[in-house]
Curated annotation (Swiss-Prot):
It catalyses: UDP-N-acetyl-alpha-D-muramate + NADP(+) = UDP-N-acetyl-3-O-(1-carboxyvinyl)-alpha-D-glucosamine + NADPH + H(+). One of its GO terms (molecular function) is UDP-N-acetylmuramate dehydrogenase activity. Pfam families: FAD_binding_4, MurB_C. Pathway: Cell wall biogenesis; peptidoglycan biosynthesis. This is UDP-N-acetylenolpyruvoylglucosamine reductase. One of its GO terms (biological process) is regulation of cell shape. Gene3D superfamilies: 3.30.465.10, UDP-N-acetylenolpyruvoylglucosamine reductase, C-terminal domain (3.90.78.10), Uridine Diphospho-n-acetylenolpyruvylglucosamine Reductase, domain 2 (3.30.43.10). Its cofactor is FAD. The keyword Cell membrane does not apply. Its EC number is 1.3.1.98. The keyword NADP applies. Coiled coil: none annotated.
Amino acid sequence: MSCIQTTFNEVLEKSLNHILDGIRPQIEAIDDAAFVAVTFAELTTLHLGGTPMAAVRCRSQHSVVEVVRLLDAHQIPLLIVGGGSNLVIADGEIPLVAVILDCDDISVTLDTGRVVAEAGAVWDDVVRLCVDAGLGGIECLSGIPGSAGATPVQNVGAYGAEISDVLVSVTLLERATGAVMEVPAADLELAYRYSNLKFTGRGVVLGITLQLHTDGMSAPLRFGELARVLGHEGPHPAVQVREAVLGLRAGKGMVYNEADHDTWSAGSFFTNPIVPESVGDHVRSVVGDESMPCFAAGEGMVKLSAAWLIDRAGFAKGHQGPGGRVSLSTKHTLALTNRGNATTDDLVALAREVRGGVMDAFGVLLEPEPVWVGVSI
């Protein structure tokens, strides 16, 4: 970074801090909102990231709305933080305010299967509560780290299911107007790991509404590995599917455990690439493997397995990055992990190495799944 850029950043940060100091009493006066001293390494499942210029913990939807409106009115950059499971944040001082979602009410209506969860609710708590209550439809999404509010933003999915399968609407704070509105799922343009909320900053999800089955059964299973574990495609009791999914995820290091560095990750780091059929044919010809994972993904397009591509490009489970401080998980090539004393720069170096290796081997560009703040791949 040049001296000029460094000086500009220092001036910007001082200016933002001055503005923030001016509205601090107003934020402190908001019910259920409180300033807290915290680093992003403490807020993310990667245990990486520097220090925001301030952090505000919000324990109600109302406090989220009021804090965001106030920060936006004074043009202070902010980052909404829920479970912190899908964030890659730069080292050092980060010139923004972290707004931490701590509103976590979950309401379940058993006779209709309607579920309403506030954005800060732990996602797997939502799944567990629903399955235990005899509702089906989200059991395949068991064990995914993070908060309920993050699930529609990137249309979270696993084991053949996506949140779009059951999402009715989101309660959204529209930042341009400050209005709170109920947005139907159909208006979110939900697609593979995408919604029109992703990367845009246009709104803050305050809550989600889901429609589940009341018979306690899963939908027919669309993921071969899961169907094999359970013996057939089903339907199966949702509680049985949840147990199987948690077992599969744990075996891949995809259930967060603070004591296990294999789970200090952002989950699946790259999305499965959707490419023209000709590219899929090229990859197959390079490896000479007719059993290559390849799935139809619309007219003339196929979806490839990012984990398979990474492995076939020569990056085995446990492949180490700079100084061994980061590595691919020893259980799954798609998870990039902090081995306990890494920096974000270490992680970015490993991500670039893997991405570049896959491009060199197959001509396929892997796209990262997490949200990047202050750093890029």
